[in-house]
């Protein structure tokens, strides 16, 4: 469970920076 959550949280900043571009 935790590895999956951490993986999803790690993806969020890159998705947000892509949207901000």
Curated annotation (Swiss-Prot):
It is found in: Secreted. GO terms for cellular component: extracellular region. Keywords: Amidation, Antimicrobial, Secreted. It comes from the Eukaryota. The modification Lysine amide is found at residue 21. Expressed by the skin glands. Coiled coil: none annotated. Antimicrobial peptide. Belongs to the frog skin active peptide (FSAP) family. Brevinin subfamily. This is Brevinin-1OKb.
């Amino acid at each position: 469970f935790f590895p999956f959550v951490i993986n999803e949280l790690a993806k969020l900043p890159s998705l947000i920076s892509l949207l901000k571009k």
